[in-house]
């Protein structure tokens, strides 16, 4: 939304929207990450399980939907500047990258702010996974599965947005 708001009306290149886009990308995985909080659901004596489930699911789905809506905005903004095939390729990549971010948050306990507060340790951890991929099968399993899930959800929502609903009278 900020990119749309502050973009230059002229045809000249402006760095500002791309900086905003970089910050958006840094925090985007937090939206689908909330789904992994469902792993913490346990039966408790004083609180009904259905209450915890409905509360957590409502927050997780709301976060996911707002995240995917923000991606729709980024998609539309990029399509005005880049070839459609390139934007589709980038969107698929962003969603798999988000799967990797979800893995880093859920299993390695890193978060977006660690890029500023502890960048070397975070970059070392990321580099280790790329330099020694066979030593980290869980990394790639979670990344691929979450990437597939996020891509499935995003492209379903995008196809609904693109196709008008026809009613018959």
PLM segments and residue spans:
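Membrane-interface helix-boundary motifs at transmembrane edges
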Residues: 4-16, 76-86
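Transmembrane alpha-helix boundary signature
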Residues: 2-9, 31-42
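Short, membrane-exposed interhelical loops at transmembrane-helix boundaries
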Residues: 114-136
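Interfacial helix-loop-helix junctions of multi-pass membrane proteins
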Residues: 38-39, 104-118
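Hydrophobic alpha-helical transmembrane segments
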Residues: 56-65, 129-150
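Hydrophobic alpha-helical membrane-insertion segments
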Residues: 21-26, 90-109
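Transmembrane alpha-helical segments in integral membrane proteins
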Residues: 65-77, 143-167
């Amino acid at each position: 939304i900020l990119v749309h708001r502050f973009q230059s009306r002229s045809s000249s290149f402006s760095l500002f929207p791309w900086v905003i886009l970089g910050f958006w990308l840094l925090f985007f995985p937090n939206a689908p990450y909330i789904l992994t909080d469902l792993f913490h659901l346990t039966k408790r004596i004083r609180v009904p399980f259905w209450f915890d489930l409905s509360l957590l699911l409502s927050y997780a789905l709301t976060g996911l939907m707002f995240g995917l809506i923000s991606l729709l905005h980024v998609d539309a903004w990029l399509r005005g500047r880049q070839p459609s095939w390139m934007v589709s390729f980038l969107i698929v990549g962003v969603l798999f990258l988000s799967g990797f971010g979800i893995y880093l948050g859920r299993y390695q306990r890193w978060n977006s702010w660690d890029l500023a507060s502890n960048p070397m340790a975070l970059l070392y951890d990321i580099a280790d996974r790329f330099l020694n991929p066979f030593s980290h099968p869980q990394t790639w399993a979670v990344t691929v599965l979450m990437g597939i899930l996020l891509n499935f959800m995003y492209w379903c929502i995008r196809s609904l947005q693109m196709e008008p609903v026809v009613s018959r009278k």
